[in-house]
């Protein structure tokens, strides 16, 4: 049975189910190409701004229609572990596919936006729209991109999908709206009378119309309150240069330096989400790679807490030489092993760190340095991360300065569950407002 005349009809029907979002701080994000005509109708009905999230499926080389994952803007990568195992793909084969698709992703992003800035998502509801869901790899990547860009809430809205769509997107979308979930679902096109391909030119035309006709009604100006500084930077940390991203808003109240966990980088989706929230609250942020690519190849370096802490100390010293950050009080936000490094660095007399926040951290890796931490410290742990919770409880008993342990109910180690990372960001923001902006710790 055909449920929709075409993508426009599907979008109008979908908009009716999303009517409760009217008047809220919404950005509608279409997945090109087929999702954009649907998203246009949703944005038009909600009088919300329309943008695209460009993602590319990663197809198995000998069976391209079977996706083993997807990539999105800003380095987001999602893998389907079952497909990878079942097809016996190795890293070299996957990397070759990803390199090719990355070129196409960049081309499309430039073509579709035509020089316009990405619409900011910080503090907004991101409504991600496609013409339907098949494997879901593309939409999952899109959800992660939206969250990385600071969306307060991620809603996935599609006209048609499998009957287990809600379960599939647990941990990716906060809410899933799907008009039809046929018991015998085999393809997105089965719900449409007209399912002809959408061209690049049509995508551009829809975005142009939305920008002209109703973007202003959404009251979101991409150029409003631009950061004073928002750029990739090269930092000399000891004997090596490391890559970072520095964001400084107007009249910053302090700066938070992020220390990522093992196997991560300055592109960490979760850290970038927290950083966007902090920037929105008036804090400058620096996300940087604790190790060079060459150093990362030696796995021992990843867990060399003294080395990682020395990088934090060096970077903190570098910030003191930058005109935009020299006078700002400094805080650390550490995740996993990065939290251990942050606590070691905070205990070092060469730096004046005013506050520390740990997300799913390993403070036990800080060893004897815990006994010298006087900066107010917030330890955030998931309620279902039992082993790490016990490690943090022991660390709290050792840290002599103010130390608070907060448990996020229902969260596992990575805070992937809907709403849990948002709680982390709010807790961190409140902690830095209370402790980074006031007088420093005594001792």
From Swiss-Prot:
What conditions trigger expression of this protein? A member of the dormancy regulon. Induced in response to reduced oxygen tension (hypoxia), low levels of nitric oxide (NO) and carbon monoxide (CO). It is hoped that this regulon will give insight into the latent, or dormant phase of infection.
Keyword Electron transport present in the record's keywords: the answer is no
GO cellular component, as recorded: cytosol; peptidoglycan-based cell wall
Q: Which domain of life is it from?
A: Bacteria
Mind listing the UniProt keywords for this protein, alphabetically? Transferase
InterPro entries in alphabetical order: AB_hydrolase_fold, Dienelactn_hydro, Hydrolase/PRTase-associated, PRibTrfase_dom, PRTase-like
Pfam families membership: DLH, Pribosyltran
Q: Give GO terms: molecular function aspect only.
A: hydrolase activity; transferase activity
Keyword Transferase in record: yes
The family this protein is said to belong to = In the N-terminal section; belongs to the purine/pyrimidine phosphoribosyltransferase family. In the C-terminal section; belongs to the dienelactone hydrolase family.
Q: What is this protein called?
A: Putative phosphoribosyl transferase Rv0571c
């Amino acid at each position: 049975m055909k449920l929709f005349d075409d993508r426009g009809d599907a979008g109008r029907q979908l908009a009716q189910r999303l009517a409760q979002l009217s008047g809220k701080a919404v950005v509608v994000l279409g997945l090109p190409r087929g999702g954009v005509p649907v998203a246009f109708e949703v944005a038009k009905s909600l009088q919300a701004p329309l943008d695209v999230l460009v993602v590319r499926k990663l197809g198995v080389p000998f069976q391209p229609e079977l996706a083993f994952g997807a990539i999105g803007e800003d380095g987001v990568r999602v893998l389907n572990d079952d497909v990878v195992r079942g097809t016996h793909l190795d890293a070299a084969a996957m990397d070759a596919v990803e390199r090719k698709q990355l070129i196409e992703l960049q081309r499309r992003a430039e073509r579709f936006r035509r020089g316009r800035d990405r619409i900011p998502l910080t503090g907004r509801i991101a409504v991600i729209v496609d013409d339907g869901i098949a494997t879901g790899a593309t939409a999952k990547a899109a959800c992660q991109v939206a969250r990385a860009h600071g969306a307060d809430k991620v809603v996935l809205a599609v006209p048609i999908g499998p009957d287990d769509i809600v379960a599939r997107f647990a941990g990716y979308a906060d809410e899933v709206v799907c008009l039809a979930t046929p018991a015998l679902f085999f393809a997105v096109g089965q719900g449409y009378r007209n399912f002809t391909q959408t061209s690049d030119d049509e995508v551009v035309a829809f975005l142009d119309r939305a920008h002209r006709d109703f973007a202003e009604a959404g009251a979101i100006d991409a150029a409003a309150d631009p950061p004073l500084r928002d750029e990739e930077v090269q930092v000399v940390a000891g004997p090596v240069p490391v890559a970072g991203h520095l964001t400084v808003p107007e009249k910053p109240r302090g700066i938070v330096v992020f220390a990522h966990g093992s196997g991560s980088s300055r592109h960490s989706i979760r850290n970038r989400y927290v950083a966007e929230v902090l920037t929105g609250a008036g804090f400058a942020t620096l996300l940087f790679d604790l190790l060079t690519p060459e150093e990362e190849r030696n796995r021992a370096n990843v867990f060399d807490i003294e080395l990682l802490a020395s990088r934090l100390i060096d970077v903190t010293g570098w910030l003191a030489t930058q005109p935009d950050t020299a006078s700002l009080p400094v805080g650390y936000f550490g995740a996993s092993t990065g939290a251990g490094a942050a606590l070691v660095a905070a205990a070092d007399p060469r730096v004046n760190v005013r506050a520390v926040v740990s997300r799913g951290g390993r403070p036990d890796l800080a060893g004897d340095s815990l006994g010298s931490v006087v900066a107010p410290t917030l330890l955030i742990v998931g309620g279902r991360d039992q082993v790490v919770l016990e490690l943090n409880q022991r660390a709290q008993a050792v840290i002599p300065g103010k130390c608070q342990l907060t448990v996020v109910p229902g969260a596992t180690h990575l805070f992937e569950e809907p709403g849990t990372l948002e709680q982390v960001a709010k807790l961190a923001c409140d902690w830095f407002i209370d402790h980074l902006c006031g007088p420093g710790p005594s001792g």
